[in-house]
């Protein structure tokens, strides 16, 4: 919106300095600042409203100390993240870029699924909220839409069903008709992974912010013909606009941490975690970096694997020995360390550090090929 207004003023009057609106870096920075300010300024009012309406029920399987600390805190804070990102994205990104719309759509789509889940748990007092079946339907539906749209719309003709492989130079893989199932799988897997990670104050917001920052950097490089040629990575015309929305997401997460850092005043709930997870997946798919996610988003992978291993081992040992046994004290992984007596703040910061290391490892793929 502001992009087109400032562009019109620049073409009409040619005032000094207005040409900067054409630069991705300027608009990404502006979107970041706008998103941060919206989150911080709107946060207190939203928290006050949610405190009077929506208090998150604590999971019964959570550690006792964790349950005690989390009583009487509002959820659905993800609405703040979504609002900040959508407003900032619409203000500073180009309307005619389909990449922008698909990212914003995915955030709103999965944010709505998460909101319904939170609403059923908090307001309707339905234990478990939205059933796993309907969550899966929502995730698969989004995946099918994104898959078919990017597969058959001419705007996405570059590479189409091909993608790059990390650590290998000039090596591409063509999904062919497997492309759409791959899109569905990645969106479902990543949104669930972020949802599993959202269990401690600041954990999901911090790790998501780091991952999206990395994706935003890759988006900027893939959308720049000079940088992409120099680094020998896929060039995607118009993909640079993804960086604008990415920075809005990053700073929405940072702004949310203002209220969600320990001791938290609000939780993002499934509204936020599912929205962030879908955004990460869609951004990675659009810039052809989905195969880099196991490295860049390694923290989410570890959290998901801890749950999968725990459940699988428990079922196997129950079948084999007559009683279920556990690998971890509790899953996901962050609760394992909680049960070991680690302070919540220490777990969160260490997971942030691990995510930063994964981010640096992903940067190394630009040269280690």
From Swiss-Prot:
Domain of life where this protein originates: Bacteria
Alphabetical list of Pfam families matching this protein: Glycos_transf_4
One annotated Gene Ontology cellular component of this protein: plasma membrane
Keyword Disulfide bond appears in the UniProt entry: no
Segments passing through the bilayer: 30-50, 73-93, 99-119, 140-160, 171-191, 202-222, 239-259, 266-286, 291-311, 346-366
Reactions this protein catalyses: UDP-N-acetyl-alpha-D-muramoyl-L-alanyl-gamma-D-glutamyl-meso-2,6-diaminopimeloyl-D-alanyl-D-alanine + di-trans,octa-cis-undecaprenyl phosphate = di-trans,octa-cis-undecaprenyl diphospho-N-acetyl-alpha-D-muramoyl-L-alanyl-D-glutamyl-meso-2,6-diaminopimeloyl-D-alanyl-D-alanine + UMP
Sequence similarity: Belongs to the glycosyltransferase 4 family. MraY subfamily.
Protein name stated in the entry: Phospho-N-acetylmuramoyl-pentapeptide-transferase
Species per Swiss-Prot/TrEMBL record: Chlorobium phaeobacteroides (strain BS1)
């Amino acid at each position: 919106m502001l992009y087109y207004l400032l562009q019109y003023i620049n073409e009409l009057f040619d005032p000094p300095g207005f040409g900067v609106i054409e630069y991705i870096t300027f608009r990404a920075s502006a979107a970041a600042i706008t998103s941060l300010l919206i989150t911080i300024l709107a946060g207190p009012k939203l928290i006050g409203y949610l405190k009077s309406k929506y208090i998150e029920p604590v999971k019964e399987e959570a550690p006792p100390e964790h349950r005690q600390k989390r009583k009487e805190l509002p959820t659905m804070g993800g609405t703040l993240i979504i609002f900040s990102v959508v407003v900032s994205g619409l203000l500073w990104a180009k309307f005619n870029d389909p990449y922008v719309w698909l990212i914003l759509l995915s955030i709103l789509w999965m944010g709505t699924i998460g909101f319904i889940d939170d609403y059923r748990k908090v307001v309707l007092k339905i234990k478990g909220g939205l059933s796993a079946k309907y969550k899966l339907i929502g995730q698969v539906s989004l995946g099918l839409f994104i898959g078919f749209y990017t597969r058959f719309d001419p705007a996405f003709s570059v590479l189409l069903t091909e993608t790059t492989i990390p650590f290998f130079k000039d090596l591409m893989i063509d999904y062919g008709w497997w492309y759409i199932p791959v899109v569905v799988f990645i969106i479902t897997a990543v949104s669930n992974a972020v949802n599993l990670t959202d269990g401690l104050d600041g954990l999901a917001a911090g790790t998501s912010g780091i991952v999206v920052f990395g994706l935003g950097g890759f988006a900027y490089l893939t959308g720049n013909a000079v940088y992409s040629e120099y680094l020998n990575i896929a060039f995607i015309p118009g993909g640079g606009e993804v960086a604008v929305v990415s920075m809005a997401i990053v700073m929405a997460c940072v702004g949310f941490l203002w209220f969600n850092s320990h001791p938290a005043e609000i939780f993002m709930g499934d509204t936020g975690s599912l929205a962030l997870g879908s955004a990460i997946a869609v951004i990675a798919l659009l810039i052809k970096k989905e195969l880099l996610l196991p490295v860049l988003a390694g923290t989410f992978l570890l959290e998901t694997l801890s749950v999968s291993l725990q459940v699988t081992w428990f079922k196997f040992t129950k079948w084999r020995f007559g009683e279920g046994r556990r690998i971890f004290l509790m899953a996901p992984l962050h609760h394992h360390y909680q049960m070991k007596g680690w302070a919540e703040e220490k777990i969160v910061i260490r997971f942030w550090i691990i995510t930063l290391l994964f981010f640096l490892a992903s940067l190394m793929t630009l040269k280690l090929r």
